[in-house]
């Protein structure tokens, strides 16, 4: 009997070891100096580097990436065209990162936001290029001030082979653009939600992550939940993301300014915050209250897209949502969106922890 019990225990331990994996690594600047207190995550677990820039983390079989929450004053370094803020988890047990110190202080910075470029055909790229060059011209007026961009999803319209050309056209902006995953960025006709992120992750890395600029903590989430049938989805944050967000925010001082970017809006009206309507299941987030609760200790702004209209909602005294108009408007059919708002981009000026637009 003892031998049987020992065998069972050994098998169970082996099974656990297959799922769990201990990894380590470093976060250094471009001169090779280790950076202390940098947050590193696998999309669930979150740790900080020690005084020498070293980290150790237990990860599991569901984790696909390890990434750095880029600290304020730094940007993700690029080596031979590879962005170094994330790495795909594999057989290696060591993952080293490099971040590059910015030339200027980023306490005051600018954020340019676009939503739903939704390029469905290569013939639409000239239209996108007009906007990209316009953004580039605006950036030049900032006279070297810190600025970066965010795309709130639906980068393309189902045809993910267009991603490389999209990236090329957006380079005309002259700035780094972080990306959010949209429902049109999903890999469809699979049987699991996790598989719906395949194409996006292959091009842009993790579908949820965080970074810091100045005094602001930025969070990117994926609330396009694939239900395992055709291309159908709902607005929903899965348990893993909510657990990760709680772990991530544990390193952010209470009262800080937090900007959350996602694709499907959490709310479009006061009424949808009071009661849930099944007809809206693909237009607003079903479990928004869980997100609101995590953001309660902070001064927060949520940025969303998806609707191709403009909408601002004051959710609480310390929480607002801006639903940003689509860059493609009514799918590149004219100069306005579905509600008549002009197509274009939104500009946010961040002065310390204060946001104006």
Residue ranges of model-derived segments:
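A short, solvent-exposed beta-strand micro-motif common in secreted/extracellular proteins
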Residues: 46, 61-78
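Short, acidic Ser/Thr/Gly-rich low-complexity loop/linker segments typical of extracellular
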Residues: 44-58
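Short Pro-Gly-centered beta-turn/loop motif in secreted/extracellular proteins
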Residues: 33-35, 56-65
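Extended active-site neighborhood of metal-dependent phosphoesterases/phosphodiesterases
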Residues: 72-77, 85, 160-254, 277-301, ...
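N-terminal active-site segment of His-dependent metallophosphoesterases
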Residues: 22, 70-164
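Hydrophobic beta-strand segments
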Residues: 38-42, 65-66
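Short acidic, glycine-rich surface-loop motifs adjacent to enzyme active sites
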Residues: 249-275
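Structural motif
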Residues: 21-36
């Amino acid at each position: 009997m003892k031998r049987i019990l020992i065998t069972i225990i050994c098998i169970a331990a082996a099974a656990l070891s297959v799922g769990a994996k201990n990894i380590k690594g470093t976060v250094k600047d471009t001169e090779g100096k280790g950076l202390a207190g940098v947050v590193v995550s696998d999309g669930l677990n979150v740790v900080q580097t020690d005084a020498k820039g070293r980290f150790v983390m237990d990860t599991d079989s569901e984790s696909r990436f390890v990434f750095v929450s880029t600290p304020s004053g730094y940007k993700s370094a690029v080596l031979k065209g590879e962005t170094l803020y994330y790495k795909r988890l594999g057989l290696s047990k060591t993952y080293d990162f490099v971040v590059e110190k910015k030339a200027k202080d980023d306490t005051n910075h600018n954020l340019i936001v676009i939503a739903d470029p939704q390029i469905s055909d290569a013939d639409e790229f000239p239209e996108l290029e007009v906007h990209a060059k316009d953004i580039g011209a605006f950036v030049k007026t900032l006279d070297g001030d810190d600025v970066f961009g965010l795309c709130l999803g639906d980068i393309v319209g189902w045809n993910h082979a267009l991603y490389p050309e999209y990236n090329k056209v957006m380079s005309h902006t002259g700035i780094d653009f972080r990306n959010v995953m949209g429902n049109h960025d999903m890999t469809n006709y699979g049987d699991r939600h996790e598989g719906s992120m395949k194409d996006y992750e292959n091009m842009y890395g993790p579908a949820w992550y965080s970074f810091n600029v100045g005094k602001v903590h930025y969070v990117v989430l994926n609330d396009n939940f694939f239900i395992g049938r055709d291309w159908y989805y709902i607005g929903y944050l899965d348990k893993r993301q909510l657990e990760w967000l709680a772990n991530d925010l544990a390193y952010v001082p209470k009262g800080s300014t937090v900007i959350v970017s996602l694709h499907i809006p959490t709310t479009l009206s006061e009424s949808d915050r009071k009661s849930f309507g099944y007809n809206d299941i693909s237009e607003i987030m079903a479990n928004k209250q869980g997100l609101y609760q995590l953001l309660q200790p902070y001064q927060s702004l949520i940025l969303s897209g998806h609707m191709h209209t403009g909408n601002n909602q004051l959710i609480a005294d310390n929480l607002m949502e801006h639903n940003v108009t689509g860059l493609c408007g009514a799918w590149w059919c004219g100069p306005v969106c579905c509600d008549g708002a002009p197509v274009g981009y939104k500009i946010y000026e961040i002065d310390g922890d204060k946001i104006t637009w």
